[in-house]
């Protein structure tokens, strides 16, 4: 039995589908429908007599001064993103490991997002930072900080110096888009973004990854891999080896649940696919071996 629909029948099916307009995920009609469904759902939830108490408890838990300040360790410092009633947009801050072990750590502010939003007149929402320093280098960390104007998926990314606690003058900056990036070297970024008409998937995410050198215009970036418009998206990735080299690659999400992983061999023009299951995630490298977390059984060849 054929597993495809004859074109005439496919056209008839499309014509009879009353919800085909929802495929235009950014269209006014689809977004208006979503807003209506959200309002309907919220009204239903708020009608529950327990709603107010649950909401109050959730807000108190999320904004409690007693909650654990989870952090990331860099150069012997613990970095933490913190929000409270005073700092609604949040603080990026750091403290020493010794101070962090105390009941009341002494935090140093790295970046105040409320202050940044007020200074720049933007509704900035912090969406994370991708930081890098070459192994064995005395240089400080540089980070690509992702900022969303209003909390949407699209962000701008700006280079930030953790040593000076300032955005880098004439540093890397990407325009607003649904995008992803990874450091390939102190002066090289792997970028997936909106490269123009026809470069986004139906989900609105990029499917082309390029290599961008410092000082060069973004438009001159070298294409490394091109996925397909039917993918969920394609994003760059980089894994640091024990000798300091960077393993450059990309993650091509065929579906929401499955991903193909590629690496870009130095001196080669074509990417090479890693022979790992589509329901898995590379987590790092240890003693020359790739560490992979699995979401399905795997019997390596």
Model-flagged regions — what are they?
Residues 1-301:
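Beta-propeller folds
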């Amino acid at each position: 039995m054929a597993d495809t629909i004859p074109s005439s029948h496919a056209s008839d099916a499309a014509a009879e589908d009353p919800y085909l307009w929802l495929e235009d995920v950014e269209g006014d009609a689809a977004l208006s429908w979503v807003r209506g469904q959200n309002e309907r759902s919220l009204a239903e939830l708020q009608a529950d007599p327990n709603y107010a108490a649950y909401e109050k408890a959730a807000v108190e838990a999320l904004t409690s001064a007693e909650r654990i300040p989870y952090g990331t360790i860099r150069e012997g410092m613990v970095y933490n993103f913190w929000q409270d009633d005073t700092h609604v947009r949040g603080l990026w801050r750091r403290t020493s490991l010794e101070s962090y072990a105390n009941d009341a750590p002494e935090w140093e502010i790295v970046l105040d997002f409320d202050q940044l939003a007020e200074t720049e007149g933007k509704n900035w929402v912090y969406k994370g930072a991708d930081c890098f320093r070459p192994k064995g280098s005395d240089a400080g960390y540089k980070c690509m900080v992702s900022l969303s104007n209003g909390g949407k998926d699209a962000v701008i990314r700006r280079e930030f110096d953790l040593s000076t606690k300032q955005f880098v003058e004439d540093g890397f900056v990407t325009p607003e888009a649904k995008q992803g990036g990874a450091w390939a070297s102190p002066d090289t970024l792997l970028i997936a973004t909106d490269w123009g008409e026809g470069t986004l998937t139906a989900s609105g995410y990029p499917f082309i990854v390029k290599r961008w050198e410092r000082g060069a215009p973004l438009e001159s970036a070298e294409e490394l891999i091109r996925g397909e418009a039917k993918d969920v998206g394609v994003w760059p990735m980089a894994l640091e080896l024990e000798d300091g080299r960077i393993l450059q690659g990309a993650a091509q999400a065929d579906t929401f649940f499955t991903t193909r992983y590629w690496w870009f061999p130095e001196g080669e023009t074509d990417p090479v696919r890693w022979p790992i299951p589509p329901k898995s995630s590379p987590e790092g490298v240890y003693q020359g071996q790739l560490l992979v977390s699995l979401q399905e059984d795997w019997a390596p060849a």
